[in-house]
Amino acid sequence: MSIPLAIRAAFWIWFFAALFVGRFLLLQKFPPPAGQGVVLALTAALVLTYRHAAAFRTWVDALDLRAIVLFHVTRFVGFYFVFLYRRGELPYAFAVPGGIGDIIVAALALVVALFSFGEATRLHAIYIWNVIGFIDILLVVFSAVRIALAGGGRELIALTQLPLSLLPTFLVPLIIASHLAIFARLARARAVT
């Protein structure tokens, strides 16, 4: 099996494991902030794999930066956060600031990735977008930790059920790790010039 195929297979296995966790409500079996602990552990695993597994790092670094940025359109999930707040299923302190921040980051990802820029301008735009997106996702995670600890996890129960359980078990670790990979790529590009 080729390295790229093995990496894709690993991601599919991880995705199906995340679906399993959500389907059987496994995050509910642990005290808060277990979901955020899962985010931390999975992000650390991705970062360590990127740092120490040359084949994985080569595969990630071969991806077009615009493709990595476009992955962040998944952050339009922020609209769903706001919708769930309006239905009373997520607290304002998490859903509205986090949702609006994610919507902005997703919209900016489209601009940065799809608009016609010169290479230097694109790299600068990606850097600015990456800083904004990274800060936003960290604020969302820290907000979730604070709310989970203060309320015993009841306010964020929606994050333990599908489809939102895919956030801590799959999507958010990929988002954080992708921001770190973009920072690494941009630093190397800057060092070359």
Where is each model-derived feature located?
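N-terminal membrane topogenic signal
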Residues: M1-F11, R188
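Hydrophobic core of alpha-helical transmembrane segments in multi-pass integral membrane proteins
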Residues: W12-R23, Q36-H52, L110, F134-V141
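Juxtamembrane "helix-exit" motif on the non-cytosolic side of transmembrane helices
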Residues: L19-K29, F81-L90, A144-G151
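A glycine-rich, hydrophobic loop/mini-helix early in the fold
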Residues: K29-G88
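Hydrophobic cores of alpha-helical transmembrane segments in multi-pass inner/ER membrane proteins
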Residues: V39-R51, I104-A113, L167-R185
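Juxtamembrane membrane-water interface segments of multi-pass membrane proteins
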Residues: T49-L63, V111-Y127, I147-G152, H179-T193
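Short, membrane-exposed interhelical loops at transmembrane-helix boundaries
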Residues: L149-L167
